């Protein structure tokens, strides 16, 4: 596929006829064209390249720098499918196929595979955009969606690793832990995740117009700390009311770590109608691995029924990973792994183009997290106690939240 031409060296056919930058840009144009054909036809594309450009194209397909292409070993016995006046038949020829379902990360040589766990998320986003069915939704925006992706997303939490995309999720998690339901407490911290769902208009649409603005009802934190209590409003003191699931989780990890009932749920059918928004991430289970001679390791698996891949899922990953770290800190464990099982995995239609931009970005190393002081009670942890190091996010990509 030489739709952009094949520049030759003016005197030596064994040498490239363009700069490294020019070759890389040309490879990117070819790959963009392949992507366009896939989107329009959903059919395979056969690509034929020749000489030095073969290595360049492979490198760029794998999302690696052009310079890495020089390390690829290629046979010189490929079929001569191109001919021009001064062709050098000792140059390798590449005849390959790009399929619509082909993802470059699956073909990285083991020595070059970055194995960055964020690719699990990026590959899922790409699959939903390409293969998801169109579905109307309650917000009126519309989505592309698939149900129950085959593999869960798994993240290594050892050595303090935190799969984090925004530090603002720290405040939301501590808000959950506190059992509070007032979105204004987050807004005062500059966190506006819940503003839309706590607005007067939205509450009125839900039949909750009698509540003051910001009163979200018995959402996540309330269920974690007061499951079964009768909800009045966001200003009521619920101390001692209902089941404190989070306290029970921590107690079980300390006293009965092999228990198979160490669960935390936010899904309470009795309260769904009085919540501003029913919970999207509804259940998590903890597992304590106690291998002989090793410190106990804490794992968490969460099930999410409604998975907004653009805005929700990356932040939910960070939030539950951090929750695992905090529970590990107060139970004498080491955080080990977080797994996410997805139900309705969807991309809102107005997020497709922004997410395509995100797919072009190479993931960066996840930051590390630790507590600045020793804490035995999870309720004593404050935002200033949480130290996140090595956080180097890409620039923000704007995506509107559908309410």
Positions of PLM-derived features:
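Hydrophobic packing residues within well-ordered alpha-helices of enzyme cores
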Residues: 57-58, 355
């Amino acid at each position: 596929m030489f739709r952009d031409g094949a520049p030759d060296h003016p005197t030596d056919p064994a040498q490239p006829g363009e700069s490294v930058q020019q070759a890389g840009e040309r490879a990117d144009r070819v790959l963009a064209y392949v992507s366009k054909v896939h989107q329009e036809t959903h059919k395979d594309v056969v690509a034929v390249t020749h000489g030095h450009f073969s290595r360049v194209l492979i490198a760029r397909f794998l999302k690696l720098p052009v310079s890495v292409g020089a390390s690829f070993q290629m046979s010189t016995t490929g079929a001569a499918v191109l001919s021009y006046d001064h062709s050098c038949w000792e140059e390798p020829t590449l005849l390959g196929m790009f399929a619509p379902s082909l993802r470059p990360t699956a073909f990285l040589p083991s020595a070059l595979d970055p194995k960055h766990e964020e690719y699990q998320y990026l590959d899922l986003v790409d699959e939903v955009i390409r293969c998801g069915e169109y579905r109307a939704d309650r917000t009126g925006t519309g989505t592309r969606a698939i149900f129950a992706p085959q593999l869960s997303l798994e993240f290594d939490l050892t050595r303090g690793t935190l799969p984090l995309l925004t530090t603002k999720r720290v405040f939301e998690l501590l808000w959950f832990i506190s059992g509070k339901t007032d979105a204004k407490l987050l807004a005062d911290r500059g966190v506006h995740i819940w503003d839309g769902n706590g607005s007067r208009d939205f509450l009125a649409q839900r039949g909750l117009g009698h509540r003051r603005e910001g009163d979200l009802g018995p959402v996540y934190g309330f269920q974690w700390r007061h499951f079964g209590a009768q909800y009045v409003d966001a200003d009521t003191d619920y101390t001692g009311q209902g089941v404190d699931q989070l306290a029970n989780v921590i107690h079980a990890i300390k006293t009965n770590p092999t228990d198979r009932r160490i669960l935390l749920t936010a899904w309470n059918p009795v309260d769904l109608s009085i919540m501003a928004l029913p919970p999207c991430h509804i259940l998590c289970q903890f597992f304590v691995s106690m291998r002989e001679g090793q410190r106990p390791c804490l794992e968490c698996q969460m099930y999410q029924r409604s998975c907004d891949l653009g805005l929700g899922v990356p932040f939910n990953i960070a939030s539950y990973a951090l929750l695992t770290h905090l529970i590990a800190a107060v139970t004498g464990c080491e955080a080990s792994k977080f797994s996410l099982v997805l139900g309705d995995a969807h991309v809102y239609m107005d997020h497709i183009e922004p997410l395509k931009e995100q797919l072009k970005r190479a993931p960066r190393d996840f930051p590390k997290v630790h507590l600045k002081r020793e804490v035995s009670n999870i309720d004593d942890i404050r935002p200033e106690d949480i130290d996140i190091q090595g956080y180097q996010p890409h620039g923000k990509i704007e995506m509107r939240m559908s309410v």
